[in-house]
UniProtKB/Swiss-Prot annotation:
Protein name, per record: Glutathione S-transferase kappa 1
Family: Belongs to the GST superfamily. Kappa family.
Modified residues (N6-acetyllysine): K71, K85, K116, K158, K165, K169
Organism for this UniProt entry: Homo sapiens
Single annotated GO MF: glutathione transferase activity
Location(s), subcellular: Peroxisome
Amino acid sequence: MGPLPRTVELFYDVLSPYSWLGFEILCRYQNIWNINLQLRPSLITGIMKDSGNKPPGLLPRKGLYMANDLKLLRHHLQIPIHFPKDFLSVMLEKGSLSAMRFLTAVNLEHPEMLEKASRELWMRVWSRNEDITEPQSILAAAEKAGMSAEQAQGLLEKIATPKVKNQLKETTEAACRYGAFGLPITVAHVDGQTHMLFGSDRMELLAHLLGEKWMGPIPPAVNARL
């Protein structure tokens, strides 16, 4: 029997493109590194407010850098990420509250579907320039992730319940307690210690903390399938 997997938590919001990048890299490595990957749907607007941080859209130079950066990362990481056409509206007006409540409901009721459902919401907003705020948009993502129409509708009906609202609030507050000022954050629990890493570009450091080998963003086992 091999060593027990170490726990790594990923706090993320589908409104955050860098969360998608970190998510995919961790999904590629979770079996290679033998980690217990825990996905934590969170609300980036709550973290921004709590920390006093500002979104890139309010800082023009940062927004321009982000657009160029994601274009380069699309090819480097082989993730089909594209800037939304109406970036400011997506980030500052539409937001992701309903989507993140839906993913919270998925995590509570059908955690085995969380990875695919999260990916399909990212694909909508950060790859195909599609909506993630309307009920039909969320249902379309859920069904594309493999849920039945009835299952998806049942989960959607729970996003306004106190249980789901409170869980999303608690997860967001947990990220803040770890010191988050944005997303994604990766929290590694290793040898009785807890390490919080911000951003999608800290995976080499995560490998070091885990005592594992970093083989680039597309490890050989994954590259063979791409």
